[in-house]
Amino acid sequence: MKIKLTNSTMVKPLSLRPTTNLWLSTLDIQMPTDYHVPTLYFYRFTGGADFFDPAVLKAALSRAMVEFYPIAGRLQMDNNGRIEINCNGEGLLFMEAEADGEMGDLGDFGPKPELGLIPTVDYSLGISTYPIVLLQVTRFKCGGVCLGVGYEHHISDGYSAIHFINTWSDIARGLNITIPAFWDRTDLRPQSPPNPRFTHIEFHASPQIKTPQNDTNHSDAVPHETVFSTFKLTRDHLNALKANCKDEDDDGKAITYSTYEVLAGHAWRCVCKARGLPENQETWLSIPVDGRFRLQPPLPKGYFANVIFTALPIALCGELQSNPLKFAVGKIHNAIARMDNDYLRSAIDYLELLPSEIDAHSRGMHLFKSPNLLISNWSKLPMYDADFGWGKPVHMGAGAIPPDGITYVMPNPTNDGGVLYALSLPKEQMELFEKLFNDI
C-alpha cells in the first residue's frame, strides 16, 4: 500500500497569549530528545460527505490550542542549557494523505511504520525547529480514516496526551472543554537542596546477562528477526489468573491483586522463560506508575506534565519459574504499593542530583532489553473516547514496533472486560512465549 500526501498545514491557536517560557520538571527533561511518540487511531467510514472534514478538525484544533497553548510552542534551551518550552504559538503540523488501498488491507491494525501514517521531521535542524505535535489524517479507498499522532514526550506523558486529543475531539463535536489543562509544574520541583531519602535503584545500571559471549541466542551482535504480536485475554482468562494468585498478608487477611498485577506477573514469567535465561539471572521489571493521585496533596485533574515514576520489582529468573504465579505477582504488588508520596518526592530529588550527561538515552532502552522488561499499563486510559463526530475509533495503538522488552497492556476496544497485551520479541522467542502465555 502506498500513501500520497495531499496537503500540509501549520495550524495555529485561534488566539495568541503573550509569549512565555514554560519550565519543565526533571521528570520532563529526562525524556529522549529528537523523538515523537507515534500512535494511530483508526475510524471506519460511517457515511456522509463531511466524514473527517479537515476544516472541522483544524478549526477545533485552533480552539483547543488556546487552552493547550504550550503544545503550539517549540522546545528550546534556556540560559543554563536546560530544555524548556517557548510558548510562541507557532502551531502544530496537520497533514492530509490518501492511501491506494482499503483499511481492511492492514489486517490487525498492528504498527506499520513503513507506510508513513505519521508525519516525520528533520531532527538535525535542532529542537526549536519542529512542532511538538504532528498530525496526519490518511483516507483509505473504503472511506475509513487513520489519524496518526506524533507526540513530543517532553511536554507530557500519555495521560495528558490523551487528555489533549480527547478535548480536541470534544470541541469538534461542539462540546465545551470539561477538564482545563493545568500547566504550573511547581509541585514537581525538588527540595532545595535536593535530599533523597531512598536509594533509587530504578535509576542505576541494569543487570547484565549471565551467558557466554559466544551465546548467539542472547547476543546483541547477532541480528534477530523481531516480531510484534498482540494477545487478547478475556475476562475468563483474567479471572483464572487471579484464582491462581490467592494470597494472604502477615495478618491472615486476603490480598486482592489487580488485573494489571496478575497479567504483568504472568507475562514476566513467560518472557523470562521464552528468553531461555539461566536460573541465577537477575531480571528487572520496570512498571510506569502515575504519580498524580499518589503525591500529596493530589495533583489537579487536568495536570499536564510527565508525572510517571518507575516501580521496580526484582527477581531471579529461577525464582519466577520455581515458585507459583503469586510469587511474581506479590513482588509487583509490593513494588507498586511502595510508590507513596515520600518515595516519589525522594525520586524527584534523586533525579535532580544525577549528572546532566546521564540523560534518557544513557539510562534508557537498555533497561528493558533482556534480561529485563517494561510493562506499561494503558488499560485504564480513555484511549477510545476520541470521537470527532463520526464515531469512536475501532483501534488505537502504537504507531511503531516497540523495541524488545517494551510491552503494553491495553483496553479491548469492545469493552468486554478483557485486555490486550502487546510486545515484540525475537521470532524464536515469540513462538515459545505464545505457548506459555496462552497456557492459563
How would you name each of these model-derived features?
Residues 22-24:
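An N-terminal structural lobe/cap that precedes and organizes the functional/catalytic core
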Residues 30, 132-138, 403-412:
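Short, surface-exposed beta-strand/loop micro-motifs that present aromatic residues
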